[in-house]
UniProtKB/Swiss-Prot annotation:
Tetramer of two alpha and two beta chains. Keywords: Amino-acid biosynthesis, Aromatic amino acid biosynthesis, Lyase, Tryptophan biosynthesis. Belongs to the TrpA family. One of its GO terms (molecular function) is tryptophan synthase activity. It catalyses: (1S,2R)-1-C-(indol-3-yl)glycerol 3-phosphate + L-serine = D-glyceraldehyde 3-phosphate + L-tryptophan + H2O. Its EC number is 4.2.1.20. The gene is trpA. Pathway: Amino-acid biosynthesis; L-tryptophan biosynthesis; L-tryptophan from chorismate: step 5/5. The active site is at 49 (proton acceptor), 60 (proton acceptor). GO terms for cellular component: cytosol. It comes from the Bacteria. This is Tryptophan synthase alpha chain. SUPFAM superfamilies: Ribulose-phoshate binding barrel. InterPro entries: Aldolase_TIM, RibuloseP-bd_barrel, Trp_synthase_alpha_AS, Trp_synthase_suA.
Amino acid sequence: MNAVAACFNALRQRGECALIPFLTAGDPDLATTAEALRILDRAGADLIELGVPYSDPLADGPVIQAAATRALQKGVKLDDVLAIVREVHQDIAAPIILFTYYNPIFYQGVEVFLDKIKAAGVKGLVVPDLPLEESDRLLEATAERGLELILLVAPTSSPERQTAIAKKSQGFVYLVSVTGVTGVRTEVGSRVEALLAGMRQVTDKPIGVGFGISQPEQAEQVKAWGADAVIVGSAMVKRLAEGTPTEGLQALETFCRELKTAIS
C-alpha cells in the first residue's frame, strides 16, 4: 500500500479524521517553508499539501495567489521546492502531497517530472487543472512509481462524473466544497453534506473536503458530515504570512493544533 492510502487506512482503523494543511512553497522564504513543514507535522497534520508557485493559478483565491506571487518574485522554482522536500521528508511522519498545475509537468515531461518528485520524497500529487479525460497517462505513470494522483470532484459534477473520478482517484478523493476558487469563507458550502452523502454511494475511498475551510468549527462540521479528511489552505497561508516569519510559524502551529483538536 502506498503512503497516502496507508495513512488513511491507519486513521480509519483508529476512527480518526485526517488534517491536511496546505502551504505555498517559498513564502515567505524557503527556510521558513522547511520549518513550517516540521511544525505542521509536530502540531498534528496527518498529510501536508505543498504548493508549487505558479504564475497563473486558476483554482487559487487571492491569499494563495499572493503567496505564489511573493515566492515567484524571489525566484522560487520547482527544483527549490523539491530541495525542501528532500531535506524535510525523512524528519516528518506526514506524507507530502505536491500541488501543482499541469504546465510544469508538461514542460518537463511526465516521466521526468514524476521521477524527480519521487526521488525527492513526494508521496502524492494534486493537479487541479487536469481534466479527468486527460488523466490516464498520469495515473498510470504515478501508479508505476508508487505515487498517488489525487483527483478533484467539483460540486457541479454529475453523479456519473463523480463516480468516474472516484474510481480513478488514487489515495483519496478531493471533494471541492464550493464552486470557484480557494479562500477563507465564513461558512462551509451548504451542499457539502449532500455531496458527501452522494459520494459515499459511489465510493468507499477516503474523501477529503477542501476549499473554504478556515475555522475549527467548520472542520468539526465537515467531519460530522462524514469527511475522512479536512483540507485547509488559505487560512494556513494567511497565518504564516502575518508578522515576522517567527510570528507566522507560531500562529501556524497554534492554528494547526486547534484544527486537529476540533476533529479529534
